[in-house]
């Protein structure tokens, strides 16, 4: 009998299951999932900002299968959210922006270098954002170079570098603490236990009022899981190949 069971997954667990397809506890993308229509940078930014602010971000829908004692969760709905979570967990600095640096922080930096012009805030933001974007973590970084660059940029003596390092270190350690907190954030998951053959229909119903699918995505979503077809339209074939190549390049295993 079909039914749904709620489960709680941390974002770290979700990310790990999405990217490590060799584990005994993994998530795979079904054939009916859509490839285009994936979130743009602004949608991803808004989603991560919601996590940072503790906003609800909806649920994920999985279908659980067990074969040879290996649990596999088919991702029925929530691909865009899952992909964005995986990106953030692997490289949180990708989601660090100029706006992540407060005016108060900039004011403290300027106080150290004995400047007091709010128009200089953008210099600090640009310099530190460029620095952190080159990293893939906020953890255990060395801040001598950006501190030295700030001191030189504002014509301050090198004797202020120590204070700059301390202030910058404290700031990015707070970002690491925030990352650790988000990694442990729980996202609700619904696990469906009905007939696997109904998954494309469930997917279609869930997404019928969301972002409209184009005609090729509708074709893909309508294909039965266990049936094969010969497609003579080369445009459709090329589209489908490109779609699943994109999934593979993102590290997903196609089910």
Task: Identify what each model region corresponds to.
Residues 2-12, 16, 30-255:
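Basic- and aromatic-enriched surface patches that contact anionic nucleotides/nucleic acids
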């Amino acid at each position: 009998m079909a039914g749904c069971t709620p489960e709680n997954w941390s974002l770290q667990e979700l990310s790990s299951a999405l990217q490590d397809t060799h584990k005994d506890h993994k998530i795979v993308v079904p054939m009916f999932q859509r490839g285009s229509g994936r979130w743009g940078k602004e949608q991803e930014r808004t989603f991560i900002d919601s996590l940072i602010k503790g906003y609800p971000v909806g649920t994920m829908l999985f279908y659980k299968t067990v074969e040879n004692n290996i649990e596999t969760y088919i991702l029925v709905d929530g691909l865009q959210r899952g992909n964005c979570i995986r990106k953030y967990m692997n490289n949180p600095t990708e989601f660090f922006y100029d706006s992540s640096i407060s005016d108060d922080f900039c004011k403290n930096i300027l106080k150290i270098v004995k400047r007091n012009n709010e128009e200089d805030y953008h210099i600090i933001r640009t310099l530190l954002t460029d620095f952190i974007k080159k990293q893939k973590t906020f953890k255990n970084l060395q801040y001598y170079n950006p501190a030295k660059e700030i001191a030189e940029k504002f014509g301050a003596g090198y004797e202020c570098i120590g204070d700059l390092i301390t202030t910058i270190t404290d700031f990015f350690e707070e970002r690491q603490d925030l990352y650790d907190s988000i990694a442990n954030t729980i996202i609700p998951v619904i696990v469906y236990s009905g007939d696997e053959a109904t998954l494309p229909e469930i997917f279609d119903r869930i997404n019928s009022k969301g972002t409209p699918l184009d005609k090729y995505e509708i074709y893909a979503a309508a294909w039965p899981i266990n049936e094969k077809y010969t497609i003579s339209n080369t445009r459709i074939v090329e589209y489908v190949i490109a779609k699943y190549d994109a999934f593979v390049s993102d590290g997903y295993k196609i089910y």
